[in-house]
Amino acid sequence: MAREKFERIKPHINIGTIGHVDHGKTTLTAAITMALASIGNTKGKNYADIDSAPEEKARGITINTTHVEYETAKRHYAHVDCPGHADYIKNMITGAAQMDGAILVVSGADGPMPQTREHIVLAKQVGVPSMVVFINKEDQVDDPEILELVELEVRDLLTSYKFEGEEVPVITGSALLALEAFIKNPKILKGENPWVDKIYNLMDSVDSYIPTPVREIDKPFLMAIEDVFSISGRGTVATGRIERGKIKMGDSIEIIGGSLRKTTTVTGIEMFQKTLTDGVAGDNVGILMRGIQKKEIDRGMVLTKPKSIDPLTSFEAQVYLLTKEEGGRSKGFTIGYRPQFYVRTTDVTGAILNMLSDDNTPLKIASPGDRITMSVKLIQPIALEKNMRFAIREGGKTVGAGVVSKLIN
C-alpha cells in the first residue's frame, strides 16, 4: 500500500518531556496526544503505546527516547519522551539534542529531585532554548501553599541555570486524571473537565512561549544517525533529525563514522510513516539509501553532503565540570583521565591530554565546579565541528558539559 504524503502546512517543532523518574512524563505525553486527538488533529496514544520498548514495560520506566507526533491549531509537533532513569541519561542526551523546547515535568507531591536538576543542566548544555513547566500530581497535594513552594523552587532552579525562571509559564494539573477522563470519553471537549482543560492550557503555553526556531536550511546537509533499520525488498533506512540543510530523492550523501567514509544515493525519505519529497532541517526522518547493508552503519555515524565535513580525533574545548549536587563527580581528575564523550548520537572514549584554568594557567587537577579548557584525543574519529556541544560521562554520571573551541587536524 502506498504511503500518504506528508503535507508541510504548519511550522514543525521538536519538543520533549524531561524530568525526574516517575514524575509523570510519559503519562503527560499520552494525555497531550489524547487531548489533541479529541479536537481532530492527532491520533491519540495511550501510555503503553509510548512506553514501547519491551524492557521498559517490564520496569515501567522509559528507556529509549520515543517519538510521537501531534498538532495544535498553530503547529505540527514531534514529541520525544525522554527517559528519567539515571542509567539512561545517555538517551536523554540524544533526545534533548533534538529539542526546540521542552516541557519540564515536576511532581507537586515531591518537588524538584536530583534528576530534575540534572535534566535542566543537560537541556542547557545541549542547547534547548526554552521550556514550559508542568507541575503534575496536583490531586495528591492537599495544601495549595505546597504547590506554590514547588513552583518557586522550580523557578529558582531554572534561573540558576540561565533559563528565564521568572517568565517561564507554569501549569499545575494531573496528567493521570486527564488521561483517565479521555479513556472514559475520548470525545471530551474543552470546558467539560477541569483536568483536561489544564492539558489544553499547557499546550497553549507551549504554542505561545516556545519560539519557532530559525532552521539552518542553507547550510550543507547533516544528520546524525539515531537508529538503523532494514526494510525487506527496499534496503537500509537511517533515522534521525536533520540538523541542517535539506535533502531530496536522488541526492548523493556521505556516511561518516569510525573508519567508514562511504558515498551513497538517497532512494526515499519518510517522516512519521508518510513520504516526503524533501527533508529539511528540523525534520525527524527516515532516509532510505542505495546499496548499503544494515551491518555497515550504526547509530552515532552521520549522513552529510559529500566532502562537507571531516572525521577527526583531536580537539580543544571549553568545559564546565558538574558539582556533586548537579550529579557530577565528588572528586577532581588529572591529565590522562579517559571518560566517554557524548557527541550528537554517539559516545566515544577520549583521553584528556592537557588542561588550563579559566585564567589560562596550566592545571594538574580539575575539580567539580571548575570551568576549564581541555585538549582531547578520541580513540576513533567522528564528525567534529567548532561550537559543537557535548557531554562528558563516566560510570553512569554526567561529569562535564562542553563546547568544541578548536579542531586539531
Swiss-Prot record:
Q: Name one Pfam family in it.
A: GTP_EFTU
Segments carrying the region annotation (G5) are: 174-176
Indicate the segments forming the tr-type G domain, all copies: 10-214
Which family does the record assign? Belongs to the TRAFAC class translation factor GTPase superfamily. Classic translation factor GTPase family. EF-Tu/EF-1A subfamily.
Quote the protein name from its UniProt record. Answer: Elongation factor Tu, plastid
For the ligand (Mg(2+)), the binding residues are T26
NCBIfam families registered for this protein in UniProt = EF-Tu (TIGR00485), PRK00049.1 (NF000766), PRK12735.1 (NF009372), PRK12736.1 (NF009373), small_GTP (TIGR00231)
Give the species.
Answer: Helicosporidium sp. subsp. Simulium jonesii
Q: Where in the cell is it found?
A: Plastid
Q: Which GO terms describe its biological process?
A: mitochondrial translational elongation
One GO molecular function term of this record is: GTPase activity
Q: Where is this region: G1?
A: 19-26
Q: Annotated region G2: where?
A: 60-64
Q: What is the lineage of its organism?
A: Eukaryota, Viridiplantae, Chlorophyta, core chlorophytes, Trebouxiophyceae
Write down the PROSITE patterns for this protein, in alphabetical order: G_TR_1, G_TR_2
Function recorded in the entry: GTP hydrolase that promotes the GTP-dependent binding of aminoacyl-tRNA to the A-site of ribosomes during protein biosynthesis.
According to the record, the residues making up region (G3) are 81-84
Enumerate the residue ranges of region (G4).
Answer: 136-139
Q: Report the catalytic activity.
A: GTP + H2O = GDP + phosphate + H(+)
EC numbers on record: 3.6.5.3
Question: Which keywords are on file for this protein?
Answer: Elongation factor, GTP-binding, Hydrolase, Magnesium, Metal-binding, Nucleotide-binding, Plastid, Protein biosynthesis
Residues annotated for GTP binding in this entry? 19-26, 81-85, 136-139
Instruction: Report which gene this protein is encoded by.
Output: tufA
* GO CC annotation, single: plastid
Sorted alphabetically, which InterPro entries does this protein's record hold?
EF-Tu_GTP-bd (IPR041709), EF-Tu_GTPase (IPR050055), EFTu-like_2 (IPR004161), EFTU_2 (IPR033720), G_TR_CS (IPR031157), P-loop_NTPase (IPR027417), Small_GTP-bd (IPR005225), T_Tr_GTP-bd_dom (IPR000795)
Kindly give the SUPFAM superfamilies that the UniProt entry links to this protein: EF-Tu/eEF-1alpha/eIF2-gamma C-terminal domain, P-loop containing nucleoside triphosphate hydrolases, Translation proteins
